[in-house]
Structure formats: C-alpha cells, structure tokens
Amino acid sequence: GFKDWIKGAAKKLIKTVAANIANQ
C-alpha cells in the first residue's frame, strides 16, 4: 500500500544520500 511505498522511497533516499556523502 501507500505506507509501503513511503517506506521504500525513504530507504532509497537514505541510500542515495549516504552514497553521495561517501563519494565526496
């Protein structure tokens, strides 16, 4: 459902931010 989509989007966002920080 929508809550699952939010959880998935949040995890993707966290992974993206973490990757950006690691690449700096």
From Swiss-Prot:
Signal peptide: none
GO biological process: defense response to Gram-negative bacterium
Known tissue expression: Expressed by the skin glands.
Keyword list, A-Z: Amphibian defense peptide, Antibiotic, Antimicrobial, Secreted
Keyword check for Nucleotide-binding: no
Annotated function: Antimicrobial peptide that shows higher potency against Gram-negative bacteria than against Gram-positive bacteria. Has a very week hemolytic activity.
Protein name per the record: Ascaphin-4
